[in-house]
Amino acid sequence: MMTSCEGVDFINNDDVTWQYCPTFAPAVLFAVLFSLTTGSHIVQAFTFKKTFSWVVIVGGAWEAIAYGLRAAGAKNIYQKGFGLPHHILIALAPLWINAYVYMVLGRMVHFFLPDKRCFGISARRLTVIFVCLDILAFLTQGASTSLLNSDTASTVKIGINIYMGGIGLQELFILIFIGLAVRFQYKMAIVERTEHSKGPWRPLLYTVYATLVLITIRIIYRLVEYSGGLHSAIATNEAAFYILDATPMFLALFSLNIFHPGRFLVGPGSEFEKKPKKAKKRKNKNKSGSGKWVLDDDGQGHFEELPLDERV
């Protein structure tokens, strides 16, 4: 059922979840654009065999679904089943893209640097730390979404403060991470003077920088938007939303299509190796009495079959 926005009071009407009348055409356009870039990421994940790319695929899918809901909401502004999920997905989707960038640089440190470390921290640990920090920002922002859609002004204000705190945390983590990226770039410059690099790394690193800048643009926009409340001039400006939120996120995903990590992280060491199982755990798997576990000098060990007359 198509509804008109004519005469609707978007400030005082609790039956609508929009700050203004959403436009149908641009919502459809970005739903298609995000669907295309996400579809490309799915194909590339299989082509380059980068299983960790599921993270960016989720982010792109959330964006595509969000704009599909926005298009549907433009036809029926009173249907909260369109508005509420849209706001949640739009708020949280960029955090998946952010996490993916953290994972990409972690693998670059692991693959390109001989010591596989940055600031003395292993590549695997760096990745885990920043993904966990991203999850913290995700949970903080996620906790605010239900409050932002409350009918009570005081609750909405609390939601705004929590959300701004969450994206503030996200930006703080990004700035720290950029410091790590700069350190990686410095170490790679030294590596290139002393030995051959495993392959081109600058295009992928510059893509990491660009993606973080695009996410930062979106964060600054959101901070300015919510600092004036849900009905400020910028919060009710749809053009600003598409220019400073939708477009940066699409460009971030698209740039990761063009300079996909799978094009640069190729061969042995391009992925984190699976951690070896501990000898004790392996020993417990052999309770049949047909052999014994012998510990090697490297701490790993091997299983030796016992003669038939010595088996339990």
Regions found by a protein language model. Name each.
Residues 83-95, 141, 159-174, 199-261:
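Extracellular loop 3-seventh transmembrane helix
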Residues 27-37, 53-66, 90-103, 130, ...:
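Seven-transmembrane alpha-helical bundle of G-protein-coupled receptors
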